[in-house]
Amino acid sequence: GGITCIMGESGAGKTTLLRLLMGLEKADSGIITGFDKVSAVFQENRLIEHLNAVENTALVIKDRNAGKCAYEQLLQLLPKEALLKPVREYSGGMKRRVALVRAMAADSEIVLLDEPFTGLDSRNSKKAAEYILSEQRGRTVISVTHDMEMCKMLGAGICLLTSGKAVATIL
């Protein structure tokens, strides 16, 4: 039910760890359990480009008012006038925010974030961090990042990864 940031140099295995937790890759040894209801922000965002932000987000909301719920969530990070445009017209930072809202809006127990602040300026990074905190709702959030300031803002524990191994943990 907490927030942990995974940090390390490029190639340390951070994204591979997230892919293992999502079941997208198979571990060489050992067993990973307890990752059934997972939502994620991938480095590539993985949005449906011809849909708008509301439609992309509503896909993961299990509520008959999914569109309204998605709209309200998105307003926290995006300008109102952008919400109904196809995401293919968005900047990289706007797409990133839609992907973040979609992951946090899903009915998941665990949220995995792969570089969630990439493409965001400092103001929008701060808003995104505040959004993560407001929408955590007791879920486990694991974020891969290079940004120590964001880890501090999230009040996150930190796990330092080197060559695929956790070499330090700061809680």
Predicted ranges, named:
Residues S122-N124:
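Helix N-cap at the start of a conserved alpha-helix in ABC-type nucleotide-binding domains
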Residues R139-V144:
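Conserved H-loop
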Residues G67-L83:
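Conserved ABC ATPase "signature" region
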Residues P86-Y90:
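Conserved ABC ATPase signature
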Residues M22:
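Helix-to-loop junction immediately C-terminal to a conserved catalytic motif
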Residues L51-D63:
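Q-loop/switch helix immediately C-terminal to the Walker
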